[in-house]
Amino acid sequence: MEKRILDKFRMGYFILYRNQGGLFSKGIIAKQLKAGFSKANAVYTHIEVSGGENHSVNISPPISKMIEIDKAHKGRYIRVMRYRNKDYEDGKRYKVAYFSAVLCNKGYDVKGILSFVFKWFKQNNRLYFCSEGAAWALQMEYPNALKGMKPEECMPAHFTDPYEFEEVWEGEL
């Protein structure tokens, strides 16, 4: 990956991944569209918190882990977003990245993602799915971020809200 692109992946920034056509992704898109998100934003079905340069925390089955973005997601279309807050750039983003890293090596909340798509599934509150983990990490520093919603109610498209997030870069890895 080119150095100029890697420079966009600062610690604590959020990386949104466009749908690749999987069964769960289609369910997430439908849920986000039903929640009122535009099609342009609803197609982002996965999110990770950047650890800086080519690293991020990937919360996906079977366990969350630190990955190398350029290897794990090569060829995927992404948007890099940052939280709109002066303190965020002055250092708070490092704490968000730290809180996200705390979630590494935890199991993935399969029941949580199923409850996200099908309301009759019960969620495990000790485990996380991708947008829930990103929201939790952000709200550890900014409790009112994402309009104060509970992390388990958060969807990847919530990180596209132009009032709370600013796009840093968009394109294919």
Where do the language-model regions lie?
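Hydrophobic/aromatic-lined pockets within catalytic cores
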Residues: 20, 52, 104, 138-146
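Activation targets extended, charge/polar-rich intrinsically disordered C-terminal tails
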Residues: 113-173
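Glycine-rich catalytic cores of cysteine/serine-nucleophile enzymes that process amide/ester linkages
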Residues: 14-87, 113-122
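A structural motif
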Residues: 70, 77, 89-113
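Loop/turn positions that initiate beta-strands
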Residues: 9-13
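Short, surface-exposed secondary-structure edge patches
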Residues: 1-8, 39-41
